[in-house]
Amino acid sequence: MKHYEVLFILKPTLTEEEVNAKLEFVKEVLTKNGAEIETVVPMGTRKLAYKIKKYERGTYFVIYFKAPTNLIAELERVLRITEEVIRFLIVKYENKKEIAAWEKLSHGIKQSKKEIKPLDAPEIQ
C-alpha cells in the first residue's frame, strides 16, 4: 500500500452538518475501497488565492491515508462528480524521504517555530 494525501475544498455555503456529511462521505469512499485513514486535518474556512467557480472562500480538509493504487482513480472520479467539492489535489509519497515526511505530518508532528518571548522592560511608574 502506498502513502497518499488528499486535500479538498468544499463550498463555503454549506452548513456545518453538510460539511460533516461530505467529509464522512469521502472517508467512506476511502475505507470501502481498502484505504487505511491515518489522520483527518480540518483546516477550516479560508480565503482562496483566486476565485474558483465564483467562490472566494472555501472549507479545507486534508486526509492522510494508505491505499492500493487502484483506489486513486475511484477517489478522483467521486471527487470530480461531487458538486460540493470545488477543488481537490491528491499527492503520492514515493521515496523514503517523502514517506518520512508523510509519517510526521500524519501524526501531527510539525516543525517547531521559535517561540517569541516578551521583552523584559522595566515598569514605568
From Swiss-Prot:
Gene3D superfamilies: 3.30.70.60. GO terms for biological process: translation. One of its GO terms (molecular function) is structural constituent of ribosome. InterPro entries: Ribosomal_bS6, Ribosomal_bS6_sf, Ribosomal_S6_plastid/chlpt, Transl_elong_EF1B/ribsomal_bS6. Keywords: Ribonucleoprotein, Ribosomal protein, RNA-binding, rRNA-binding. Pfam families: Ribosomal_S6 (PF01250). GO terms for cellular component: cytosolic small ribosomal subunit. NCBIfam families: S6. Binds together with bS18 to 16S ribosomal RNA. Belongs to the bacterial ribosomal protein bS6 family. This is Small ribosomal subunit protein bS6.
